[in-house]
């Protein structure tokens, strides 16, 4: 389920190119968009939630610069790593050319105890749904 976005001036640094942390943030937008498209209301999911999903690892690699006005598309795949951890791998395209790739690893914890807990059923279903899309090539 691709996510499309225009690069804004606020996404760029003093040199006029997208700042690396901003592209990671835009990748996170794609993740949130996917959750919403699946029917997970993010506001309700995290409001007084017994679950938190901190990012424990993030990396990004650029193959060419992105500029204000560029329209990008982000595709990502998901991989379940354990009962409480998953990873998203993003590919960022400009006019069908991959210009960057990124990865984020998320862990499910109980926010007060700060201990790992199993992913909630809604996220397990979302992970399964995305895995099915990947397998069928949709």
Curated annotation (Swiss-Prot):
Reactions that this protein is recorded to catalyse: 1,4-dihydroxy-2-naphthoyl-CoA + H2O = 1,4-dihydroxy-2-naphthoate + CoA + H(+)
TM region(s), chain numbering: none
Pfam families on file: 4HBT_2
EC number from the UniProt entry: 3.1.2.28
GO terms assigned for molecular function: 1,4-dihydroxy-2-naphthoyl-CoA thioesterase activity; fatty acyl-CoA hydrolase activity
Catalytic residues (positions): 13
Pathway annotation: Cofactor biosynthesis; phylloquinone biosynthesis; Quinol/quinone metabolism; 1,4-dihydroxy-2-naphthoate biosynthesis; 1,4-dihydroxy-2-naphthoate from chorismate: step 7/7
Keywords, in A-Z order: Hydrolase
Keyword Hydrolase carried by entry: yes
EC category: hydrolase
Domain of life: Bacteria
GO biological process terms on file: phylloquinone biosynthetic process
Gene3D superfamilies: Hotdog Thioesterase
Coiled-coil ranges from the UniProt annotation: none
The protein's role, per its UniProt record: Catalyzes the hydrolysis of 1,4-dihydroxy-2-naphthoyl-CoA (DHNA-CoA) to 1,4-dihydroxy-2-naphthoate (DHNA), a reaction involved in phylloquinone (vitamin K1) biosynthesis.
Family note: Belongs to the 4-hydroxybenzoyl-CoA thioesterase family. DHNA-CoA hydrolase subfamily.
HAMAP family in the record: DHNA_CoA_hydrolase
Protein name as catalogued: 1,4-dihydroxy-2-naphthoyl-CoA hydrolase
